[in-house]
Each structure stands twice: as C-alpha cells, then as structure tokens.
C-alpha cells in the first residue's frame, strides 16, 4: 500500500480517524465515543483526557484492523469541535473540565460584552458575543472560579489540546481562533484591545498558526501509546466548519455549503472580511491562508425533523418518514412549518421564538406535515441565502451535505426553493476529509488546497430547479416570511406561560 494521511475529526460525541491515500480514497477508518457531562442545567463539559485516550484507541484500532502501517502514514491533521475552553497551568496540566460550544452558562458575560463594546465588538471580531464562543467562557471562569483563573497560563481549543499531547507543541490555528471571538478579524492576531480592556493577559493566548502549517512530528511518548511513527508529520488543522468546507470543495465565492445536521449551516467562502453582515452571520478565518468564510446557523434543522419523527412516527425509520412526503404536493397542500422549535440564531437571534404549523386543514394528512417540515427547514435556509444575495453573492452551485443530501426528494426541494443547482458529495466524509486534505497539502502532495480538491472532492448527481416548482415555492416563501413577525409575540407569551406553570 502507498502513502496515506490521517484526518482526525474530533467531534462532540466521538472521534473519527480516516486514512486517505493520494487519490483521495478512504482506505481505513475507526472511531471511538466519549462522554458528555452536564452537571447543571445549561452546562456542557468534557474531560480533555477522554479526547486523548479515545483518539489513541481509534488510531490503534485502525492500525490493527487494516493493512495501513505506521510507516505509511506520512502526515496527519485535525478537524475539531469549535469554541470549547481548555485551560492549562504552567506545566500544561488541565485545570478543569473543558467548557463546550453548546454550554449556555455565559449569558451574563455576553450581555456585559455587548454593553462594554457595542458594535465595536463586531468590528473587531466579525461576530456578536454569543454563549457558544470561547471569550465569554474565559470571563465566566475569571468571575466564578478565581483560584483556577490565577493558575491559568494558556488556553486551547479541543483539537489544539489533542495536537499538543501528540507533539508537545502549543498552538492554535487561525480558523479555530476566530471562533474564540478574541481574535482581531482584520489583522488575524489576538486583539490587544479586548485583552487589555477585559484584563486578560495576552500571554494566555497561544501562538497562532495557519491550518496547513507544519507543527512538528509525533513525539516519542505518543508514538509508544498509539503505535504511530515518530516520523509522521503533524499539521495545524482547522475548525470543523472550515474543515467541512474544505472537504466539500467550498473554495470559491460562487459555491455555498448547506449542511443539515442537528442545526443547519449555510456557509460561503470569502476573499476578505469586508462585507458588513452586521453580526447576523458569523465571520471566521478559512483553512486557506489569508482567506475567510462566513456562515449563518439555524438552530433546529435536522432537529426539527427528528422531533417530528420521534413524536409522530417513533416506530418508523427516517427514510420511510421522509419518503412519505412524496405523497404530498409542492407547498404541502397549503401547509407551512416554521422550524423555530428551540429558538433561532440567524437571521433573527431570538431565544423566545418557537415553531408553528400554519394553515392546518381538516383534509391534511401526515404526509403533508412531513413535507411541510422538509420545506420549512429549507425556507429557513433560504432566509440566509437571500441575505447573502442582498449583499451581492451570486451562487452557481450549492453543495448539500448531512441529512438533506440523503434524499433525492429533499435535494430537489432544495434546488427548487434556492432556484439553484444543488449537488451532493459522492463519498461524504465530513470534516475528516478536510483534515486529511490539510495534511496532504501540508506535506506537499498538492501545491494548494484547491489543487487537492481537484483530486479528493467528487460530486454526485446534480439537481436543477424546475421552473414551475420555483414559481410555486416563491409564493409559499413570501407567506413563510410573515410567520416570524406574526407569531413572535404569541410564542414568546406562550413560552412565558410555560415558565410560570
């Protein structure tokens, strides 16, 4: 067997390790799960040691159960869950459990940042201060755990801690660093303004590197633990969204990525950070040196479908439930669904809005409700596509990944609502493929990530908008756009009633 690279995808619930050859083929894979701790409502934590032990287990399993040998692994890189805070002391020992991206304890710190900096915060970081980001977590520890704060000497993000344990080198790549909202989006350096005004030592911030930068080799200690070779080179890696964009070939501004996971993401490549989205969309550094991406997040994309399935069709599999939508019509026989069942982030940033079915009629069947859910999720994405188009974007292709790419019907619905060609990936591997591409480019197998994509990224069938369908969906979308404004005060009042009773 020829040379391979490893793409290590450190997710929220599991790590997946993929061995990829020079033709972009997945030749071996292994994964391992780890636990999530929720000691209090709104808290979400993990033990960083679990990331190390489970990654090691996955690597050992890959080597033992495949024909890949340690000497064939020329390099590796990472994709990582974003925003999680890992605090280290002067000996680089972890001080407390990592506070994860989905931890919501930091609302008061976010409000303080808004009050102190106003719109300047968006100008500096490209983002609003949201609970998921790392800076509010730092401020929470500073305010609530002063003894730990006094001992802290540096902070890392999840994949950066894993990289440190494998190489002994402390660093953070810039694509992940933007998600801390402590990075100056214009200079791509740590913001001295924020650090000084918030009394955060600049020395707490780790050295910054590019995603494809060479960091070091696997150290002797980790080589003995994992079975890897000390000759294997290690490269920076990227935040999961950046790595996912690389793995999907989102390398130019005429393509958008639509991802339907638990939440939903619409992501666009950006040459610079100059477009003013007024904080509605997040700005992040891309895995490409000097490039960026922006993205809008909807909170309950796949979650809405999962909720519907578990509530109304618990004994059926997802494929059967989704396929039943074919029994309905475009526009679900005049039924609309707003997928705000856990609130919304973009474009509304509203924690109190809730979902609704609009237009329920005695003639509606379950298939109509399924179709309305599928269409409503895509209408929520169309809100973000329209925001991009309002700011001058012209998309020729939309790449669909995740749950929305597993159904031909849903792919056609996307093409018709977006009025754009939609493609899926032939062999969807998620951010792990992007991590492998970063390693392959870092090694010099390819001159650039774009060159690597020519070999590694392949698209499946293209779905084109049907003119008659587009016209019908545009009428439905105009009605859909009224739902938020009309239902917001009602659902906020209902939420308050639930809290009181």
Swiss-Prot record:
This is Xylulose kinase. It catalyses: D-xylulose + ATP = D-xylulose 5-phosphate + ADP + H(+). The gene is xylB. Catalyzes the phosphorylation of D-xylulose to D-xylulose 5-phosphate. SUPFAM superfamilies: Actin-like ATPase domain (SSF53067). Keywords: ATP-binding, Carbohydrate metabolism, Kinase, Nucleotide-binding, Transferase, Xylose metabolism. Its EC number is 2.7.1.17. Substrate binds at residues 82-83. The active site is at 240 (proton acceptor). GO terms for biological process: D-xylose metabolic process; xylulose catabolic process. It is an enzyme of class 2 (transferase). The record marks 9 as: Important for activity. The keyword Transferase applies. Gene3D superfamilies: 3.30.420.40. Belongs to the FGGY kinase family. InterPro entries: ATPase_NBD (IPR043129), Carb_kinase_FGGY (IPR000577), Carb_kinase_FGGY_CS (IPR018483), FGGY_C (IPR018485), FGGY_Carb_Kinase (IPR050406), FGGY_N (IPR018484), Xylulokinase (IPR006000). GO terms for molecular function: ATP binding; D-xylulokinase activity. It comes from the Bacteria. The keyword Thylakoid does not apply.
């Amino acid at each position: 067997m020829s040379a391979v690279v490893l793409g290590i995808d450190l997710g929220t619930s599991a790590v997946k390790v993929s061995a990829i050859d020079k033709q972009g083929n997945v030749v071996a894979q292994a994964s391992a799960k780890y636990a999530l701790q929720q000691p209090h409502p709104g808290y979400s934590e993990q033990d960083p040691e679990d990331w190390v032990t489970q990654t090691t287990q996955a690597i050992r399993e890959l080597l033992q159960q495949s024909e890949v040998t340690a000497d064939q692994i020329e390099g590796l890189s990472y994709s990582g869950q974003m925003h999680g805070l890992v605090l280290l002391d002067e000996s680089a020992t972890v001080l407390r459990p990592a506070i994860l991206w989905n931890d919501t304890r930091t609302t008061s710190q976010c409000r303080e940042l808004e009050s102190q900096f106003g719109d300047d915060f968006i100008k500096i970081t490209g983002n609003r201060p949201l609970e998921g980001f790392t800076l509010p977590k730092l401020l929470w520890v500073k305010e609530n755990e002063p003894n730990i704060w006094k001992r802290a000497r540096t902070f890392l993000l999840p994949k950066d801690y894993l990289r440190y344990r494998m190489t002994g080198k402390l660093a953070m790549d810039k694509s992940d660093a933007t998600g801390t909202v402590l990075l100056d989006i214009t200079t791509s350096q740590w913001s001295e303004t924020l650090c000084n005004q918030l009394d955060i030592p600049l020395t707490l911030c780790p050295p910054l590197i590019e995603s494809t930068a060479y960091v070091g080799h696997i150290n002797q200690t980790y080589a003995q633990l994992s079975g890897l070779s000390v000759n294997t080179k290690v490269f920076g890696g990227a935040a999961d969204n950046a790595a996912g964009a690389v793995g999907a070939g989102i390398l130019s501004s005429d393509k958008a990525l639509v991802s339907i996971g638990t939440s939903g993401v619409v992501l666009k490549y950006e040459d610079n950070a100059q477009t003013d989205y007024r904080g509605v969309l997040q700005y992040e550094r891309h895995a490409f040196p000097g490039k960026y991406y922006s993205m809008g997040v909807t909170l309950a994309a796949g979650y809405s479908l999962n909720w519907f399935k578990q509530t109304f069709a618990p004994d059926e599999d997802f494929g059967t439930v989704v396929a039943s939508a074919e029994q309905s019509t475009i526009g679900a026989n005049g039924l609309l669904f707003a997928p705000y069942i856990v609130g919304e982030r973009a474009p509304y940033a509203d924690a109190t809005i809730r979902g609704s079915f609009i237009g329920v009629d005695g003639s509606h069947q379950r298939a109509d409700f399924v179709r309305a859910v599928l269409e409503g999720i895509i209408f929520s994405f169309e809100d973000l596509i329209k925001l991009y188009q309002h700011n001058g974007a012209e998309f020729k292709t939309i790449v669909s990944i995740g749950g929305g790419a597993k159904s031909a019907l849903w792919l056609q619905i996307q093409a018709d609502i977006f009025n754009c060609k939609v493609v899926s990936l032939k062999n969807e591997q998620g951010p792990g493929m992007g991590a492998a591409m970063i390693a392959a480019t870092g090694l010099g197998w390819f001159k650039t990530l774009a060159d690597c994509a020519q070999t590694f990224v392949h698209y499946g069938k293209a779905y084109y908008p049907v003119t008659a369908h587009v016209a019908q969906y545009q009428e439905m979308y105009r009605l859909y756009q009224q739902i938020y404004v009309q239902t917001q005060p009602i659902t906020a009042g209902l939420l308050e009633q639930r809290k009181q009773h």
